[in-house]
Design a protein with these regions (language model features):
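Alpha-helical hydrophobic/aromatic positions enriched in membrane-embedded helices and signal peptides
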Residues: 1-3, 98-99
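C-terminal cap/substrate-recognition subdomain and adjoining C-terminal extension
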Residues: 58-144
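Alpha-helical substrate-recognition element adjacent to the catalytic core
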Residues: 2-83
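Residue-level detector of intrinsically disordered, flexible termini
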Residues: 1, 40-42, 134, 141-142
Length: 144
């Protein structure tokens, strides 16, 4: 069976933005919810956040592990053409990598046709325990 994948944004998801003059720090409570999701669905993470710029997959894994993440970062989405939205970057990754199921966890809704797979977070709160069941349910749905 093909792998299940969480496309992960970081700002506004794992790093709540509580002040608009600076980005947030990784929140251990949000990381725990992510751990519940990846464990509950047997999923791996593909980083779709701007945090992927200038970092290797190994560096992203180490950064998340240092904050308590217990899962596996397997890749990061490609950087799209100028003006491309996140949904287009995720679609490009999916075109090259078959998956059994996927969910997008982001605080922006610019996912185009992929929005039925989106768990939208509130930027000031980040990923919440109430988001986990829906994310797991979406992950367990066949891709397509």
């Amino acid at each position: 069976m093909a792998r299940r994948v969480v496309f992960l944004d970081i700002d506004g998801v794992l790093a709540p933005i509580r002040r608009w003059d600076r980005y947030g720090d990784l929140d251990p409570a949000c990381i725990r919810v992510l751990n519940e999701i990846v464990a509950g669905a047997g999923a791996a993470v593909v980083v779709s956040s701007t945090w992927r710029h200038g970092k290797t997959v190994t560096e992203l894994q180490e950064m998340l592990e240092a904050a308590g993440f217990i899962g596996c970062v397997i890749d990061k989405t490609p950087v799209g053409a100028p003006g491309a939205d996140r949904g287009e970057e995720i679609a490009a990754w999916l075109a090259e990598h078959p998956v059994g199921g996927y969910v997008i966890i982001d605080d922006h809704a610019d996912m185009g046709e992929l929005r039925t797979r989106l768990v939208l977070t509130q930027p000031a709160r980040g990923l919440q325990p109430a988001d986990a069941p829906r994310a797991i349910e979406i992950l367990k749905r066949a891709a397509g």
